[in-house]
From Swiss-Prot:
Residues 44-91 form the F-box domain. A carbohydrate binds at R210, S211, D212, Y278, W279. SUPFAM superfamilies: F-box domain, Galactose-binding domain-like. It comes from the Eukaryota. Pathway: Protein modification; protein ubiquitination. The gene is FBXO2. Substrate recognition component of a SCF (SKP1-CUL1-F-box protein) E3 ubiquitin-protein ligase complex that mediates the ubiquitination and subsequent proteasomal degradation of target proteins. Involved in the endoplasmic reticulum-associated degradation pathway (ERAD) for misfolded lumenal proteins by recognizing and binding sugar chains on unfolded glycoproteins that are retrotranslocated into the cytosol and promoting their ubiquitination and subsequent degradation. Prevents formation of cytosolic aggregates of unfolded glycoproteins that have been retrotranslocated into the cytosol. This is F-box only protein 2. It is found in: Cytoplasm; Microsome membrane.
């Protein structure tokens, strides 16, 4: 017989005894495992021989967590590549975090820039009232209390700075306040980063009055330690918005915390407002699109 395989077994699977089948399966299971080890060793040897620019491109295609948790443990060469700037600059470029051809000298720590950029988002929940007062704490309902209204509202204007913003919080004839406390570690920012690098923490808020009534507005932001001691603070003080000021237009207030020292674990954001004419209803300061960002 000139066919492939053993002529006694080809085309006759029914003649194989039950005792022989487990042995054949066991042998088949052992061979792939050995083969996998050989293939892995061959692949590692091949990668180790790659020129550095090519190896960097191979590594840059892997998830960041695998690079830090696994690849840097493979060998000294890989550890140096994972800890170095060129790999993370390449990942930043590939994922659109920096323009192609970015200059390496622009930053000292591209790995840190990468992880901060991937985490970058508004850390405040429900900043525009889409979920009523959900996510806000220490809510003070002075006068008739807070109310969520649709833009532009009575005697107000549209919020042209961000088309996605559709609502705002309106305050009343006595002070209305609300706050949020952000746990930075729970949001993915680790102790060493906060204590050593101290990335910039940027706070922004938008407020407005009505064209038919004056109002007061205030913003206070505190950086707190693990035991809620105040390590840094910003306060706008009471800002008076006179009647007919900018036709009820929206104004931005912002502050950037830098070099705030080690130990910061929480950010407490609090703002509030009231009207200055003491009219029943919701003639006080309006707030929306509040934000807290940790910048790369």
């Amino acid at each position: 017989m000139d066919g492939d395989g053993d002529p006694e077994s080809v085309g006759q699977p029914e003649e194989a005894s039950p005792e022989e089948q487990p042995e054949e399966a066991s042998a088949e299971e052992e061979r792939p495992e050995d083969q996998q080890e050989e293939e892995a060793a061959a692949a590692a040897a091949y990668l180790d021989e790659l020129p550095e620019p090519l190896l960097l491109r191979v590594l840059a295609a892997l998830p960041a967590a695998e690079l830090v948790q696994a690849c840097r443990l493979v060998c000294l060469r890989w550890k140096e590549l994972v800890d170095g700037a060129p790999l993370w600059l390449l990942k930043c470029q590939q994922e659109g975090l920096v323009p192609e051809g970015g200059v390496e000298e622009e930053r000292d720590h591209w790995q840190q820039f990468y992880f901060l950029s991937k985490r970058r988002r508004n850390l405040l929940r429900n900043p525009c009232g889409e979920e009523d007062l959900e996510g806000w704490c220490d809510v003070e309902h002075g006068g008739d209390g807070w109310r969520v209204e649709e833009l532009p509202g009575d005697s107000g204007v549209e919020f042209t700075h961000d088309e996605s913003v559709k609502k705002y919080f309106a305050s009343s004839f006595e002070w209305c306040r609300k706050a949020q406390v952000i746990d930075l570690q729970a949001e993915g920012y680790w102790e060493e980063l906060l204590d050593t690098t101290q990335p910039a923490i940027v706070v922004k808020d938008w407020y407005s009055g009505r064209s038919d009534a004056g109002c007061l507005y205030e913003l206070t932001v505190k950086l707190l330690s693990e035991h809620e001691n105040v390590l840094a603070e910003f306060s706008s003080g009471q800002v008076a918005v006179p009647q007919d000021s900018d036709g009820g237009g929206w104004m931005e207030i912002s502050h950037t915390f830098t070099d705030y020292g080690p130990g910061v674990r929480f950010v407490r954001f609090e703002h509030g407002g009231q009207d200055s004419v003491y009219w029943k209803g919701w003639f006080g300061a309006r707030v929306t699109n509040s934000s807290v960002w940790v910048e790369p």
